């Protein structure tokens, strides 16, 4: 929910003059279909660990308005929530990847979100989904437990995160014939210590993957450089930094192989 990525960029609502299908911009959906996006992750970025899913279900006029503290302090009206995201994935033809709130959420909140999305009708949580217009449960394979928890997702050290991750994942259960592929928050760039400590503490019973975070910026984090104004030298520096990710991945894989030689994660 950064800038106009969601609002205006993807979601314009049913009553917009911009051509749309169920609120999703037709031109954007068509472009994403042409690219062939296989998996779409939401809610992305730092917003994930301050997002509370119950704020984004039910009639839009009754949804809770919050301040998006990470991205501009703008008011987030939660008109794009779980049902809207699943509609977007359906239109694109891709798999949803849900990022659970570990930073400011609770185990119960995470568990009930999975139940809301994937459990057959019958429980109070699943029945609420039905009341909100979705009779059949969705198929949700990919579940990320926390986002960038070494930074905006809670400023955690890897030992603490691993402990919290294992606690959360224990209550993220398969519902019916929906089987979860649980993903732990991986390191920031070349933080090999994070990978080492995380891999010491988890195994395939806890996680199927870890997510590596890497950003290509021309300068440093405070002075990233312009996205539209740059010379040839700056362009090639950016490409060089982008290619460096291959070396970083290889070093993280070496650490993972030490603790997981069978490549279960």
In which residue ranges do the predicted regions lie?
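Anion-binding catalytic surfaces of enzymes that hydrolyze or transfer phosphate/sulfate esters
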Residues: 207, 212-220
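Non-catalytic accessory regions flanking glycosidase/transglycosidase catalytic cores in CAZymes
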Residues: 1-209, 241-265
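Active-site clefts of carbohydrate-active enzymes
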Residues: 151, 221-239, 262-265
